[in-house]
Amino acid sequence: MAFPQQRLRRTRRTAGLRGLVRETRLSPEDFVYPIFVVAGEDVRNPVASMPGIFQLSINHAVAEALRAQDLGIQAVLLFGIPDQKDEAATGAYDPEGIVQLATRAIKEAAPELLVVTDVCLCEYMSHGHCGVIEKETGEVLNDVSLELLARTAASQAEAGTNIVAPSDMMDGRVAAIRSELDNEGFENTLIMAYAAKYASAFYGPFRDAAESAPQFGDRRSYQMDPANAREALVETGLDIEEGADIVMVKPALPYLDVLRRVRETTDLPVAAYNVSGEYAMVKAAAQNGWLDERRAVIEALTGIKRAGADIIITYHAPDVARWMSG
């Protein structure tokens, strides 16, 4: 059947018709809301490159988590900013570390809210890299770093996290973490693996927020080359074999093709991270009056879900949830 019998504009004529045939629908339950937790008391430091985002002390992080829950958001993702760093990342696996303390406080205030915790060493390392450094060469040592990552995940699980999210991109980290969790009695703690994490320019504002920029070099020796798509399927497959419960593509918008290919190769839940640079671009354009923030954000997140994401990690989560409820 063709025109004039078939007129596709018929189903676009009214808001009700458009809603009736809509193929992709966003919900607050799709979102994970990142929160940056900093040491100290009553701290609320704005992140200049991410309007509306703050470094929060634990009391404010709890309040922000409760606000998200009230908006229908079911999960928060915690990133820790310790008051001290060293070359062994001791703050990452300290039972009294910033993420561990924040996890306990949030779970006490909101037992049903899901807490996801970032498993990486960069925020805790004095040099800012995601693993242990060989001092003479500056190389990030893969296998030595696995032990610290596994200890970090187990420490977070002991604090009550529901999901650990290794973002370091060391080979074999999912298997090491799964083994450590199971050995320590945390077999029900999920692993959301940053399976396809690219060495992206879009992380810049995050590194301001998390104070995690490397002090020398870059992360291209362990994060993925932005030019590669097939490699993402290899990475994802390995993480699944090693025991990942959820696999992630990061960033989201520049890698929708990768997200679609990952979605087509696994029946596991797939997450996508709408990263800080994507957030900052929309915020900057909206503040200058160059686009409609609400429409742009919803369009971007709908595109991420349409490409195959079951879970969207986004700094826009509270705004979108509020728009939906209004």
For every predicted segment, state its role.
Residues 1-22:
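N-terminal amphipathic/basic leader segments beginning at the initiator methionine
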Residues 2-6, 27-32, 38-326:
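Alpha/beta enzyme core
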